[in-house]
Amino acid sequence: MVQRWLYSTNAKDIAVLYFMLAIFSGMAGTAMSLIIRLELAAPGSQYLHGNSQLFNVLVVGHAVLMIFFLVMPALIGGFGNYLLPLMIGATDTAFPRINNIAFWVLPMGLVCLVTSTLVESGAGTGWTVYPPLSSIQAHSGPSVDLAIFALHLTSISSLLGAINFIVTTLNMRTNGMTMHKLPLFVWSIFITAFLLLLSLPVLSAGITMLLLDRNFNTSFFEVSGGGDPILYEHLFWFFGHPEVYILIIPGFGIISHVVSTYSKKPVFGEISMVYAMASIGLLGFLVWSHHMYIVGLDADTRAYFTSATMIIAIPTGIKIFSWLATIHGGSIRLATPMLYAIAFLFLFTMGGLTGVALANASLDVAFHDTYYVVGHFHYVLSMGAIFSLFAGYYYWSPQILGLNYNEKLAQIQFWLIFIGANVIFFPMHFLGINGMPRRIPDYPDAFAGWNYVASIGSFIATLSLFLFIYILYDQLVNGLNNKVNNKSVIYNKAPDFVESNTIFNLNTVKSSSIEFLLTSPPAVHSFNTPAVQS
């Protein structure tokens, strides 16, 4: 048993390990966000006894856990490892042992992150770790160093995984499966892997320079030695902006599959969906300075970054309208994954619209570092990446586990997180427009109302997380008895196999999602005999 999980080279087992780590980290990250919202529920010091450093440590912990230990391990490590080989008809990934080490450096990174919060007074730098706040003068002691090591380890994990996915997709497709026939989820992981490959080395360079500045007396970002902290911001955001697309593009792939299945229609404009994802990925590297309009960039530089940022809205719009066109005229069934997908469309678009306001260099002078920004990126991440994660879970888990979840509870869980997330993040836009700054544990009484509302929302969202854990428990224990469409499931297939994309795709030139044609759960080694793509 120990050997199976510790030394595993099987993509399916490694995917399960990623999911377990993601669930654990997600619960820890949610706990931190709940403490943050409790502290902000009313003006003055509530629970942290005026300890602003601790507040910022919680902000760092929440951000890094949610980004590097929940969304990336679940969407890329979990769904990517499990489904990508199945969808292309491969027996496993190209480098199974690299796959193993890519997972096992993540728990080490988690240990470093947790340790960084427990030594000295923690790393209270924000997840961006900007110098001079993160310099040795402002943060003496090993906290920031440990946080940097945590980022290094997650970077190594993601880089190894990315190399594995790229080689697997290029070299291990089954007979007849050309790149144009790849399912959209495989394309999304493939494009994401390239983004990781190009952006993570830049982050690693930046935080390594910071490590040297802190411990070995270099002056990369030290003004007194001729360095420039703005250089760090450029390096960080050259990674940081592609990173947000790394978080959302696998979600795009999942939503495409879900929308197609529950509308009983092929995705509208499949090839243009691929080109849209690729364009978003490419443009993501050309807009990083929109995060730093207020550091003193030239007017013409600001003009360029404003227009380049707005251009990203075009391929994103193509994707949104293609999904709507897929739904239009379809035979729609509002099962739980479809509810998440439709909510994703509305709320991701909403997050994109607030982003258009932030793209303007002149407007951003007012919005920068206010709760408007927090509201914007949580709409995109909390209701984009997380909703797509839930959609993917409810869509594929019956096929992966061979066990059904309780549909009624799953829909209740959807409505709880839908209401909770909106109640948290919608009021933040009002707070930001009125000038409430981020990362500050106290605020004037004028901001009390909407903060109280947001804190109530965080309780609703946390309740939905507890319900999800129960749904997962119920699925594992009673999965064979749970009914689909009020009928006991007697066939050995996922409940929505009957309306899966395989039906209308098998006889066409488009790729069929072959993961639903396998047994449920799939065998330990699928495709010992290569499948042939028609």
UniProtKB/Swiss-Prot annotation:
GO biological process: aerobic respiration; cellular respiration; mitochondrial electron transport, cytochrome c to oxygen; respiratory electron transport chain
Residues reported to bind Fe(II)-heme a: H62, H378
Binding positions (Cu cation): H241, H290, H291
PTM entry text: The N-terminus is blocked.
Enzyme class per UniProt: translocase
Subcellular location: Mitochondrion inner membrane
Ranges per topology, Mitochondrial matrix: 1-14, 89-97, 172-183, 264-269, 328-335, 401-406, 475-534
Cofactor binding mode and count: Binds 2 heme A groups non-covalently per subunit.
Alphabetic keyword roster: Copper, Electron transport, Heme, Iron, Membrane, Metal-binding, Mitochondrion, Mitochondrion inner membrane, Respiratory chain, Translocase, Transmembrane, Transmembrane helix, Transport
Covalent cross-link site, 1'-histidyl-3'-tyrosine (His-Tyr): H241-Y245
Record field: transmembrane: 15-39, 55-88, 98-118, 143-171, 184-215, 229-263, 270-295, 299-327, 336-358, 371-400, 407-431, 450-474
Cofactor(s) this protein cannot do without: heme; Cu cation
Topology of this chain in the membrane: Multi-pass membrane protein
EC number: 7.1.1.9
Pathway where this protein functions: Energy metabolism; oxidative phosphorylation
Residues bound to O2: Y245
Catalytic activity from the UniProt record: 4 Fe(II)-[cytochrome c] + O2 + 8 H(+)(in) = 4 Fe(III)-[cytochrome c] + 2 H2O + 4 H(+)(out)
Recorded GO MF terms: cytochrome-c oxidase activity; heme binding; metal ion binding
Primary role: Component of the cytochrome c oxidase, the last enzyme in the mitochondrial electron transport chain which drives oxidative phosphorylation. The respiratory chain contains 3 multisubunit complexes succinate dehydrogenase (complex II, CII), ubiquinol-cytochrome c oxidoreductase (cytochrome b-c1 complex, complex III, CIII) and cytochrome c oxidase (complex IV, CIV), that cooperate to transfer electrons derived from NADH and succinate to molecular oxygen, creating an electrochemical gradient over the inner membrane that drives transmembrane transport and the ATP synthase.
Record text on subunit structure and interactions: Component of the cytochrome c oxidase (complex IV, CIV), a multisubunit enzyme composed of 12 subunits. The complex is composed of a catalytic core of 3 subunits COX1, COX2 and COX3, encoded in the mitochondrial DNA, and 9 supernumerary subunits COX4, COX5A (or COX5B), COX6, COX7, COX8, COX9, COX12, COX13 and COX26, which are encoded in the nuclear genome.
Name the UniProt record assigns to this protein: Cytochrome c oxidase subunit 1
Organism, as annotated: Saccharomyces cerevisiae (strain ATCC 204508 / S288c) (Baker's yeast)
Gene behind this protein: COX1
